[in-house]
């Protein structure tokens, strides 16, 4: 059975978000096409996603020195445990669907924090004599991103840092089979917003058949 993580990073629901509407349309179609698969929703705004901070570095330092989990402070234990949960869930999945908005040329900070939780040496990638090697080969990912302007092509494509960063991190951990759906231009062309949304939903439903 294939396990799919539906990873969202938007405080708004599908009623208030173009990206979430497309994301939910995709996952509904995916479930219809693949009823045997398991879909797990991870709402990053309602999930504990520790940032790498002094507590985390201190905990890693203790582990490197051979000290056990019991030697950590309560705060360190809570953060490390949450990070380990996020990491294990990510490693045990086969497909990833990220749904994010663009905020000032990138995605919400919680997405970066989540990627810091799952891009871990010795777990999702390893160092070799020839450089780092991803350990999650054979998995697939989809990124659905909503942007007010047009960033998938043209002059602004270079500043689509969220899309580029996510693709880079996924490739780094071995997930090189990636798809992308742009839900874009709604603010630049408000009179076409509904048309843009409907076209993206149709694209998402079609992709769900072969994802």
Curated annotation (Swiss-Prot):
Cofactor(s) required, per the database record: FMN
Domain of life of the source: Bacteria
A single GO molecular function term of this UniProt record: oxidoreductase activity, acting on NAD(P)H, quinone or similar compound as acceptor
Full protein name: FMN-dependent NADH:quinone oxidoreductase 3
EC number(s) per entry: 1.6.5.-, 1.7.1.17
Residues binding FMN, per UniProt: 102-105
The reaction(s) this protein catalyses: 2 a quinone + NADH + H(+) = 2 a 1,4-benzosemiquinone + NAD(+); N,N-dimethyl-1,4-phenylenediamine + anthranilate + 2 NAD(+) = 2-(4-dimethylaminophenyl)diazenylbenzoate + 2 NADH + 2 H(+)
HAMAP family: Azoreductase_type1
Gene3D superfamilies linked to this entry: 3.40.50.360
Oligomeric and partner information: Homodimer.
Cited function: Quinone reductase that provides resistance to thiol-specific stress caused by electrophilic quinones.
Annotated cofactor note: Binds 1 FMN per subunit.
Alphabetical list of InterPro entries matching this protein: Flavodoxin_fold (IPR003680), Flavoprotein-like_sf (IPR029039), FMN-dep_NADH:Q_OxRdtase_AzoR1 (IPR050104), NADH:quinone_OxRdtase_FMN_depd (IPR023048)
The family this protein is said to belong to: Belongs to the azoreductase type 1 family.
The entry's keywords: Flavoprotein, FMN, NAD, Oxidoreductase
Native organism taxonomy: Bacteria, Bacillati, Bacillota, Bacilli, Bacillales
């Amino acid at each position: 059975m294939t396990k799919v993580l539906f990873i969202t990073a938007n405080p708004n629901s599908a009623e208030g978000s173009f990206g979430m509407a497309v994301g939910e349309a995709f996952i509904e179609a995916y479930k219809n096409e693949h009823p045997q698969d398991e879909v797990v929703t991870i709402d990053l705004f309602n999930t504990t996603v520790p940032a790498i901070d002094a507590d985390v570095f201190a905990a890693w330092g203790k582990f490197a020195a051979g000290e056990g989990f019991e030697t950590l402070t309560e705060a360190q234990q809570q953060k490390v445990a949450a990070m380990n949960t996020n990491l294990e869930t990510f490693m045990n999945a086969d497909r990833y669907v990220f749904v994010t908005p663009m905020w000032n040329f990138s995605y919400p900070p919680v997405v970066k924090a989540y990627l810091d939780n799952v891009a871990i040496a010795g777990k999702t990638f390893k160092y070799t004599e020839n450089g780092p090697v991803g350990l999650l080969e054979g998995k697939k990912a989809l990124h659905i991103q909503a942007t007010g302007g047009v960033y998938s092509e043209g002059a602004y494509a270079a500043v689509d840092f969220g899309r580029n960063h996510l693709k880079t991190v996924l490739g780094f951990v071995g997930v090189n089979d990636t798809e992308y759906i742009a839900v874009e231009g709604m603010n630049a062309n408000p009179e076409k917003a509904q048309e843009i949304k409907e076209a993206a939903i149709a694209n998402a439903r079609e992709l769900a058949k072969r994802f």
